[in-house]
């Protein structure tokens, strides 16, 4: 049936029934688009990057001084494993490239956390793949403080989103 012959409700129903023929490739394209959207929410983090709060003073400096030993060092009473791992990798880069690396790593963590919703494990909860794409977009676009957006400080927040989504997901079909 040509597209012009379908009613609006039929087109909406078709969107709801959409299932990608290549789910992994489709998810990768959607996550890549999400990365671009994440970066466009605060372009100054990429065009004029800088270290924010603990990013430089705590994570980066301690990574330089203590090396990988800083990864398991608590800060303010709890471990910051992922931010410290990112800082450990960033400590091998020139100082001028470190803030940009931190911003890109933070964006990758954000879209990866939200990208979990695209998994087949969410089919029982949200059967429509199109609806899962919408939820992915809504998670990425949720309002938050711009000053910590695309910084290592926001990484733990995105880990919380990933943990919450993992709790909602269906059990994996393979081990």
Go through the PLM ranges and name each one:
Residues 36-55:
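Helix-to-loop transition at the C-terminal end of transmembrane segments
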Residues 130-146:
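Membrane-embedded helix bundles of polyisoprenyl
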Residues 156-175:
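Specific aromatic-rich, kink-prone transmembrane helix
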Residues 1-37:
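Start-transfer (signal-anchor) and selected internal transmembrane alpha helices
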Residues 118-122, 141-150:
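Juxtamembrane "helix-exit" motif on the non-cytosolic side of transmembrane helices
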